[in-house]
Amino acid sequence: MKKLIFSFFLCGATMFPAFSQTYQELSERAVAATEQDSLSLAEKYIEQALKMEPANPHNALLFSNLGTIQCRQHRYEQALDSYTLALNIAPRAIPALMNRAALYLELGKDDLARIDYSLVLDIESDNQEALLMRAYIYMRQRNYNFAKSDYERLLKLAPQSYNGRLGLATLEQKEGKYEAALSILNAMIAEKGGEATRLTTQQYAVLYVARAGVEQDMKHVDLAMMDLEEAIKLDASQTEAYLIRGQIYLSQKKKELAKRDFEKAISLGVPQGDLRDLLLQCK
């Protein structure tokens, strides 16, 4: 996010070279303050610049970066207002659209996020992040055909996209197309150690968890357990691995082991209330 703010300001400085020096200095000071995580100071500089030249077209950039600062401070509604003000000035500003879409999604406003990602794709049809995120939203909304279309468009642009392939595998699983999901995940896992892929151990752990989930749906419990063990060995913080394994243990009447895994998931950040029913079944 810091890189986005910095490059956005530099872009503005190039596009609008006729700013007064003071306005320019305030913009640059805001960049420096943001890079040093002095967010309140950065906000102060931006507000001074906006007040100094309220009609300056460069204010689209200032409002967008003000929104990002407010977002980092968890002032989400103010951040949305700032992104919207930026887009009122520059409706085709892709960084502002992407930032607002991401914030809408975080706030659970999926339809508004989808609209912004669609606007980005109207402007830049090969924007991979917008395709990925819109596909994710479509999948959450059970619009599986639209989701698949976006994943396939993404994978034509970037055939090795980790998130695109994983997303498509998840979609196939949700549609009950387990063999298709396994085919994708098997291929991704088989690439481990190859020159074509540079994935982290955490990313590989996610793949093993994803495959275990498909295997669980297929009632291949032994295979699922093997993949979950591998996932935890690669990354012991994989919350989903403990949840799936706990559910398998519970189905096998191994209540103490199930309880241990659910408690581990809680220690990793899963709200205890979300697992209350499962924990009650462990008694």
Where are these regions (language model features)?
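Register position in tetratricopeptide repeats
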Residues: E35-Q36, I69-R72, E106-L107, R140-Q141, ...
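Structural marker of alpha-solenoid helical repeat scaffolds
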Residues: M52-A55, I89, I123, L157, ...
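Canonical tetratricopeptide repeat
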Residues: N65, N99, M133-Y136, G167, ...
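Helix-start (N-cap) detector for alpha-helical repeat units in TPR-like alpha-solenoids
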Residues: Y23-Q24, P57-L61, I94-P95, Q128-E129, ...
